[in-house]
Amino acid sequence: KPTKLTRTIPTVSFDSGMVFERDASLFGKSTTQTLEPRLFYVYTPYENQDDVPLFDTGRSGFNYAQLFSENRYVGLDRVSDANQLTAALVSRFIQEDGAERLRLAIGQRLYFEEPRVRIAGEAAQQSRYDLLLAAGGTISESWTFDSGVQYDAAGSSLYSSNVSVQWRPGKMKAVNAEYRYQRDSFRNIDLSAQYPISRRWYGVGRVSYALRSYGVGQAVNPSTGSKLIESLIGLEYQADCWVFRMGAQRFVTAAQTTSTPIFFQLELNGLSRLGLGNPLESFNKSVPGYTRLNAGIGRP
């Protein structure tokens, strides 16, 4: 059996747009409103990837970033084939300090070919045309939100949706909640956080729970259709000149199969990192808004 798998999958994309601006007011505050027509085309040829193990890759929840994404999956185990064109109109409200207060987008995606790469439990793309809606912005100084809807125009039904909120009350503090839905595939809730426990100790965690799951890759509880599909727990200790991280992560790799890697790391500020696994990568991927404790000191 081969001990190393390699893939070479080319991707060609074309992104074009224009930006128009005008003075506006939002909730009584002066802002600059933009109007941004945009065209995004991506082509990735199909390649059978069934010989590549599926570890931590899943279908991304639909939001603004997915409007102009080349790969519909999160993770490196699958590269989606694509031959599609997205036409969108984006409007932003930008405050005087440069912060984006509100973002609205509407678009339509044309599939020239039906995507053939799919993971277990993922429903096939049934429509050549999808209506895309997205909204995001700042609710207050510490609260932000992001949301998106993908509507199947041909079938007159909702294909996927996503809504997330984030609370960032201060430095090294982030709490996230997200709901993701895809028709005939999944309905998940994700909760994640980075938060100080004491002056030097910080906790990191994530829980991803399937409220309803379909297909071989997720359905393991036929009585309720629900299950825990991913969890992460981690601790960090910050000293004057070093940081120690440790954690464990559990996720579903296939039907009835789970993986639980354990990792730890000692980082000497500005010098090097020693340990088992890569907790920094896991924390960054699992917790939106995660901040490295010694950020700004220097990266080894």
Language-model features and meaning:
Residues 1-300:
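Outer-membrane beta-barrel translocator/pore domains, especially the C-terminal barrels
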